[in-house]
């Protein structure tokens, strides 16, 4: 019998909650020449759909991107093998929606529950954008490029930058439906700094916020800062006293930075609750554990992933990889940490596994330069997006080793390899996949209906 007419026995099943997508649980035969499209036709026929629904297929957790015959050959299986084939609604290609122009390179992004976008820029300004591309507010105060921004709530945010500080910002008057953060904030105007957080000795490049009013910051001074979103809970810093005590030890540049900050003499200054030390190289990203905010993670140019007990401020686990790590995202349902690296790939790690066990569970390959930003899909536990200095954003399903889709920069003035580096990505359920970088653009690729219903 020719390979074209050969068949394999299989069973289709799905984990989709929609009962209308469930086929009868019974084995059947299918041509081994079928690929994704042909299998999708078979499932639609079994479901009796007049309007076809595109599906993706997995065998033993591996996303099928080849024919059944090629799959059998790849895994050394014969056509006598019985296959359990999982199907799930296919992901549609994210289409370009819009882009907004900024004054300088955009280093960081976040999206609030109000669907407002905040951006941090190399011109030292934090901006709030609506989805029409209008700047609603600008927040000035940092004396150097901003490297990280994060919403605390719809009325509070935090930023960090090359001036070695974090700033707590008031974005608007408190909504009466939300709890009051600080009773004496009423004297602070919208768009003003609530407090300057000092303690790092090098640029602050990463920030994460927990739901229990805590902040983590990663810095190029090799430390992680642990702070409160409520400034009253932190120790007061007296800038004049510090300047006086350290005047003889401070460099000229340090003295200049300190004098610049003294211009904001009326702004509160606070010290960290703790500075966590263990890394031997710059800390590139930090994150609270999705399920337990007393646990934190950090990745560094020193090649390590560290797990922290934030109650005791102790490092409780270190995993050493072969490359500098530049970005971090959690896949909480899968209990995995995704790490972007200087080696151009993304590695998946299980933080529960001891450092003596296998360090890397999987590797995603496709980028051609540093992978500097990651974010997970809000609607699919297996998916994430990545931003790279190669000028692209890639969409991944971690069950496959190669990207599903590649998003390029839409700006006409972008020159490949010159001004196309992507510095930040964010995947929002309501807004879409947002990316920004060296082209001074905030780009949105359509996220609505990315999963066909």
Curated annotation (Swiss-Prot):
Subcellular location, principal: nucleus
Functional summary from the UniProt entry: Component of the NOP7 complex, which is required for maturation of the 25S and 5.8S ribosomal RNAs and formation of the 60S ribosome.
One function term, GO molecular function aspect: ribonucleoprotein complex binding
SMART domains: WD40 (SM00320)
InterPro entries for the chain: G-protein_beta_WD-40_rep (IPR020472), NLE (IPR012972), WD40/YVTN_repeat-like_dom_sf (IPR015943), WD40_repeat_CS (IPR019775), WD40_repeat_dom_sf (IPR036322), WD40_rpt (IPR001680), WDR12/Ytm1 (IPR028599)
WD repeat segments: 101-139, 141-179, 199-237, 278-318, 320-359, 366-406, 417-453
Name this protein carries in UniProt: Ribosome biogenesis protein YTM1
Phylogenetic placement of the source organism: Eukaryota, Fungi, Dikarya, Ascomycota, Saccharomycotina
Annotated region described as Ubiquitin-like (UBL) domain, given as residue ranges: 8-89
PROSITE patterns documented for this protein: WD_REPEATS_1 (PS00678), WD_REPEATS_2 (PS50082), WD_REPEATS_REGION (PS50294)
Family: Belongs to the WD repeat WDR12/YTM1 family.
Cell compartments where the protein resides: Nucleus, Nucleolus; Nucleus, Nucleoplasm
Region (Sufficient for interaction with ERB1 and association with 66S pre-ribosomes) location: 99-453
Gene Ontology cellular-component terms listed: nucleoplasm; PeBoW complex; preribosome, large subunit precursor
PANTHER family in alphabetical order: RIBOSOME BIOGENESIS PROTEIN WDR12 (PTHR19855:SF11), WD40 REPEAT PROTEIN 12, 37 (PTHR19855)
Gene Ontology BP term (one): chromosome organization
Highest taxon in the source lineage: Eukaryota
Subunit structure: Component of the NOP7 complex, composed of ERB1, NOP7 and YTM1. The complex is held together by ERB1, which interacts with NOP7 via its N-terminal domain and with YTM1 via a high-affinity interaction between the seven-bladed beta-propeller domains of the 2 proteins. The NOP7 complex associates with the 66S pre-ribosome. Interacts (via UBL domain) with MDN1 (via VWFA/MIDAS domain).
Keywords: Nucleus, Repeat, Ribosome biogenesis, rRNA processing, WD repeat
């Amino acid at each position: 019998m020719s390979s074209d007419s050969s068949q394999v026995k299989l069973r289709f099943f799905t984990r989709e909650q929609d009962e209308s997508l469930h086929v009868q649980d019974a084995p059947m035969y299918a041509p081994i020449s079928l690929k994704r499209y042909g299998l999708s036709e078979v499932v639609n026929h079994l479901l009796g759909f007049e309007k076809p629904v595109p599906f993706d297929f997995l065998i033993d957790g591996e996303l099928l991107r080849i024919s059944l015959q090629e799959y059998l050959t790849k895994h050394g299986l014969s056509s006598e093998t019985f296959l359990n084939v999982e199907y799930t609604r296919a992901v549609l290609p994210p289409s370009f929606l819009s882009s907004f122009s900024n004054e300088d390179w955009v280093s960081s992004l976040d999206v609030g529950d109000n669907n407002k976008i905040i951006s941090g820029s190399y011109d030292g300004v934090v901006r709030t954008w609506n989805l029409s591309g209008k700047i609603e507010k600008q927040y000035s105060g940092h004396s150097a490029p901003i490297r990280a921004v994060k919403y605390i709530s719809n009325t509070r945010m935090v930023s960090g930058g090359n001036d070695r500080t974090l700033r707590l910002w008031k974005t608007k008057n408190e909504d009466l439906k939300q709890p009051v953060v600080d009773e004496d904030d009423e004297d602070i105007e919208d768009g003003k700094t609530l407090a300057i957080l000092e303690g790092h000795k090098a640029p602050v490049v990463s920030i994460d916020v927990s739901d229990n009013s805590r902040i983590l910051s990663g810095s190029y001074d090799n430390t992680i800062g642990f702070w409160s979103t409520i400034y009253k809970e932190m120790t007061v810093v007296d800038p004049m006293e510090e300047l006086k005590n350290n005047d003889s030890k401070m460099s000229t540049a340090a003295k200049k930075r300190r004098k610049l900050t003294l211009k904001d003499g009326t702004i509160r200054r606070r010290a960290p609750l703790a500075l966590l030390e263990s890394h031997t190289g710059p800390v590139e990203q930090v994150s609270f554990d999705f399920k337990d905010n007393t646990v934190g993670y950090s990745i560094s140019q020193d090649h390590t992933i560290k797990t922290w007990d934030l109650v005791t401020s102790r490092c409780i686990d270190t995993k050493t990889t072969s490359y500098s790590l530049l970005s971090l995202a959690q896949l909480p349902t899968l209990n995995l940490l995704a790490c972007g690296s200087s080696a151009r790939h993304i590695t998946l790690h299980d933080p529960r596994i001891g450092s003596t066990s296998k360090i890397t569970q999987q590797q995603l390959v496709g980028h051609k330069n540093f992978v500097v930003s990651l974010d997970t899909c809000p609607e699919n536990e297996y998916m994430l997006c990545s931003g790279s200095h190669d000028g692209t954003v890639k969409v991944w399903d971690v069950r496959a080793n190669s990207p599903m889709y590649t998003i390029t920069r839409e700006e006409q003035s972008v020159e490949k390899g010159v001004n196309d580096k992507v510095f930040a990505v964010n995947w929002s359920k309501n807004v879409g996949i947002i990316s920004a970088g060296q082209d001074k653009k905030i780009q949105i690729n359509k996220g609505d209906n990315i999963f066909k219903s």
